[in-house]
Amino acid sequence: MALLQIAEPGMSAEPHKHRLAVGIDLGTTNSLVATVRNGLSVCLADEEGRAMLPSIVRYRADGAVQVGHAAAPFQATDPKNTIVSAKRFMGRGLKDVAYVEAMPYDFEDAPGMVRLRTVQGVKSPVEVSAEILRALRERAEASLGGPLTGAVITVPAYFDDAQRQATKDAARLAGLEVLRLLNEPTAAAVAYGLDNAAEGVYAVYDLGGGTFDLSVLKLSRGVFEVLSTNGDAALGGDDFDHRLFCWVLDKARIAPPSTEDARRLQLKAREAKELLTACESAQIQCRLASGEEVDLVVTREAFAEMTAHLVKKTLGPVRKALRDAGLAPEDIKGVVMVGGATRMPHIQRAVAEYFGQEPLNNLDPDKVVALGAAIQANVLAGNRASEDDWLLLDVIPLSLGLETMGGLVEKVVPRNSTLPIARAQEFTTFKDGQTAMAFHVVQGERELVADCRSLARFELRGIPPMAAGAARIRVTFQVDADGLLSVSAREMSSGVEASVLVKPSYGLSDDEISGMLREGMERAGDDMAARALREQQVEADRVIEATEHALAADGSLLNAEERASIDAAIDALRALRAGTDHRAIKAGIDALSRATDEFAARRMDHSIRAALTGHKLDEFQT
């Protein structure tokens, strides 16, 4: 749905003027920019008619920067200063980057995000990506004849908060106003759905250069609803290249290659992979720096066999996404293929076998994401045509919650919740007179904080002193349409408030993102048992503390035998609390409750008598 354009009366500047907005697919291997012209989404080409811009940036010693096709020839001759696949480094520390040893770059493991040393100094992946975005912005402004209102930039559905924030930072450096960060599979579904007037449940299989996502969407009368999403933020076409590169090293008995030789062979491996899409075999020929000649032939069958484990790895997220949506493969009306890597025949074959139908390939898998992003950008810019009556409902991929007493996770926003979303939940104090509360925001599917990803911490101070459990603290989670999170806490009686905009310093590791849901499923039983134990331990602590407080205040109401009975019940509960049987702890809590029933009744009577002393009965009558 188009955003409503609001202005003061008489102050609306050219209300009917078409606003220049674009969709950008910032890809690992290639990037594109698209816009809507005459109601149709089209990719914008450079002066030589090329729509795709290689995601390559070269820093030269003279201070100049080359981007795209101009930088590509220097991958082998100047590998340290020619940065390829920078998207794989966005929001990540060095330990999170796969195949570091095979890369020619001079890495610096800086706090928060890995950096690369170049002839122009240390560069972050954000700066490298900004150069690509700047080149696309300049291409768009030259093609459209004016400055851009803004851009919708696509990101993998499984990009975490740090990676999304890094993408927005790169756009700002490039002079772009970000209208929305849009998940790549969702953008593809928008392009496919509007192009084909499709309705029903569709799966989007998105295998890019560095990431994989599977999203399940329901398309109905112009509503694009994401039912579920799953994926692997460190699996893509580059991994297929790397496997073929390793095969070449093994067959040619090269170990270890020089930086320049490694880059040459990696490029030859990628060329061979692309040839195998159309041919049954491909020749890999390369002259090494030593003068040695590499001359190998790889068949399509051999390549499929050596990368079968990677294809299988994509099917895990496929199964999980369908399970989360409550669907079976036969419930899917069509499978939209996205990303150049999906052109590989054994990928097409595996998807067809799993879903029992041939995947949809009537839109260019390299361009479909940019085309969908352009459609969304056109709507968000306010260029709404009469037929543009549609709504986009995206989701959050992993649950968000808070740490509670005992190291437990209270999930506030469950995974696959529709974006944007705001969810509030009330919490209370644990101790009498508590005037502050610390909040720990976490992300993940496990029951214990130790098994989830820490996102942020903040404190709420100035809570009025009250009895334990009397204060009401309302905590609100807000996730915007870009998938970025903010959390606020407010004490309801006093109005004191604190908040935090979640900006983690680095992203989830590869295994953490792809494994969170798997671990959540596999360990659900153990997690629930651990949660039950922690809950009973916390309740035991609360009951013991409350009982001891009552004994200190009104112990004189008990005789020696009664006091001894309650003390014995407290000691027994303390011993049980140190154990691992949550049922035994629950029984101990119940036993202490029974032991204090008479004491509680006497305290109530004592309080009532104290309140009535010195007053006449008619004073309390109305």
Curated annotation (Swiss-Prot):
Biological role: Chaperone involved in the maturation of iron-sulfur cluster-containing proteins. Has a low intrinsic ATPase activity which is markedly stimulated by HscB.
Pfam family name, one: HSP70
Molecular function terms, GO-annotated: ATP binding; ATP hydrolysis activity; ATP-dependent protein folding chaperone; unfolded protein binding
Keywords: ATP-binding, Chaperone, Nucleotide-binding
Any single GO BP term: iron-sulfur cluster assembly
Source organism of this protein record: Azoarcus sp. (strain BH72)
Full protein name: Chaperone protein HscA homolog
Matching InterPro entries: ATPase_NBD, Heat_shock_70_CS, HscA_NBD, HSP70_C_sf, HSP70_peptide-bd_sf, Hsp_70_fam, ISC_FeS_clus_asmbl_HscA
Gene from which this protein is expressed: hscA
Entry-linked Gene3D superfamilies: 1.20.1270.10, 3.30.420.40, Actin, Chain A, domain 4, Substrate Binding Domain Of DNAk, Chain A, domain 1
Sequence similarity: Belongs to the heat shock protein 70 family.
NCBIfam families: HscA, PRK05183.1
